[in-house]
Design a protein with these regions (language model features):
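Extreme N-terminal "head/tail" segments of very large remodeling/mechanoenzyme assemblies
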Residues: 1-149, 157
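Cytochrome P450
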Residues: 161-164
Length: 164
């Protein structure tokens, strides 16, 4: 599984819609994401894990905490991920549960968590959050725990790797 494009909106420190073209990094399979503390590096991992599994990459972040506190209340919170698996491109869009302005009148309303997985062939999309997580797990053969241990080396785990 190789991430191609990641789009995040009102997610973590990213207040506005931000697109990261991961495919431009090449096909070597190992990427190093560096930057200053608080620059949003871990959020990139969180967004990929959230798109695939509905949970952040670390155990200390609940889905309800993923909405950006810097975002305009009207900006929707979502993550989209295009990824390549066995020569086929899949698309996932997922949003956490969060409060948003009502469509009519004043006040806020709860935006329920939602997800959709689109296949590269003529299969119908999977449209329920739990079903998307199940379909992703079956497709790539890794659950969230396995994925975060194998595909990502999150902040704080680097020293564990060095001394193992």
């Amino acid at each position: 599984m190789r991430p191609i494009k990641l789009t995040i909106s009102a997610f973590g420190p990213y207040a506005k819609e931000t697109e990261i073209i991961l495919d431009e990094l090449g096909e070597r399979g190992l990427y190093l994401i560096t930057g200053d503390t608080g620059a949003g590096k871990t959020t990139i991992f969180d967004a990929i894990a959230f798109a695939l599994y509905g949970e952040a990459s670390g155990n200390e972040r609940e889905p309800g905490m993923l909405r950006s506190k810097y975002a305009d209340p009207k900006t929707p919170t979502f993550v989209e991920l295009d990824f390549l698996y066995q020569g086929q491109i899949y698309h996932i869009r997922r949003n956490p549960e969060y409060m948003r302005p009502k469509d009519r009148g004043e006040g806020m309303t709860l935006q329920r968590a939602d997800a959709v997985l689109e296949f590269p062939d003529d299969r119908l999309p999977v449209t329920k959050a739990k079903e998307v997580t199940k379909a992703v797990t079956e497709l790539i053969g890794l659950d969230r725990g396995q994925f975060t241990q194998i595909a990502m080396l999150a902040q704080g785990d680097f020293m564990k790797l060095l001394f193992s």
